[in-house]
């Protein structure tokens, strides 16, 4: 990650409106990963990541920051929900599976990078195998010395046609590696055993080939992936993945507030507190057994987030609070924020709806006053009913464009090239009455 904090924030600004404090915190945390790697070995070991706790109401951008961060990080990244885990001894997934999933993510990410690196060599090898199936090499005889030259010319001609896609629909018989994948259904919490069994069956079927009849296009893809897999050094890949997880891994734990203890202690709270206590060694630093080997979690960055509308950050066990030293509060959204969300981000909601309806030949245009009125209604409905943040915009837009989406084909032919204008009047006529009636808006919007 060689991007500076300012560049990271700038990239996040393309997709997320406001929440500058949260963006700055994750940008600094991400940059510190790079800074740490520049230090001498003896000092690098001592520098541990400063984990982050993001606090804010639902629908203000906590999860979206995680999603965008995953794309920027170019590091093993996993997002999990705290509610999916149970303490050791209860039926369900234990928290150590977070690190096992992170190891899987690292292997997948690095394998894709390696596959891309060897792609050209794999494509050449795959082409040769397809051409061998199309044109079996001629046997050498004493009578005809010109055969190799003619054969080479024919092969080059077929190679050209193959690259141009002229042979895509031709059917050939070719030997490809047998798919050794096998699905094993096991109860929650037994993922490690499942992985071991799958690896065992995969190794048993390794190297076996099977003749299959396929179209050239499908065969080329299969053979290319097979050749690329052969060029990738699995042992080297595992070693790199292990280092990537330990030194650059990022875990985003969502809904952390749902495992916080609430005022009245009930039976379920025992399990909640147990999950927190199981998370402690993971965040502090421990060793977890994965398919890559033993993974140390000392330098993995943990970012936790929660709405905390039924509980407070102080309801988390004190040790866990201490392991999340950086606190960031995300603010509730204002009507102006809603307006900006609808118009400013890259691939905004309004842009998405315009593009979707354009596929039917129907043009719609969102006018500034229409967007403003839509933002006001979203804010009003949130204030009157449950505040679900920017997610309210999805509900409103679906309701607003329901008739247009249903009759898009008919409207396209009726309007020719004229665009349907979504202005304040249009918004009021479709949503105004619903927004004013609290009972209706509670159930419909």
Swiss-Prot record:
Gene3D superfamilies: 1.10.8.60, DNA helicase RuvA subunit, C-terminal domain, P-loop containing nucleotide triphosphate hydrolases. It is found in: Cytoplasm. ATP binds at residues 17, 59-64, 254, 319, 391. Keywords: ATP-binding, Chaperone, Cytoplasm, Nucleotide-binding, Stress response. Transmembrane segments: none annotated. One of its GO terms (molecular function) is proteasome-activating activity. It holds the Pfam family AAA. InterPro entries: AAA+_ATPase (IPR003593), ATP-dep_Clp_protease_ClpX (IPR050052), ATPase_AAA_core (IPR003959), Clp_ATPase_C (IPR019489), HslU (IPR004491), P-loop_NTPase (IPR027417). GO terms for cellular component: HslUV protease complex. GO terms for biological process: protein unfolding; proteolysis involved in protein catabolic process. Its main location: cytoplasm. Belongs to the ClpX chaperone family. HslU subfamily. ATPase subunit of a proteasome-like degradation complex; this subunit has chaperone activity. The binding of ATP and its subsequent hydrolysis by HslU are essential for unfolding of protein substrates subsequently hydrolyzed by HslV. HslU recognizes the N-terminal part of its protein substrates and unfolds these before they are guided to HslV for hydrolysis. PANTHER family: ATP-DEPENDENT CLP PROTEASE ATP-BINDING SUBUNIT CLPX-LIKE, MITOCHONDRIAL-RELATED, ATP-DEPENDENT PROTEASE ATPASE SUBUNIT HSLU. A double ring-shaped homohexamer of HslV is capped on each side by a ring-shaped HslU homohexamer. The assembly of the HslU/HslV complex is dependent on binding of ATP. This is ATP-dependent protease ATPase subunit HslU. The lineage of its organism: Bacteria, Pseudomonadati, Pseudomonadota, Gammaproteobacteria, Pseudomonadales. The gene is hslU.
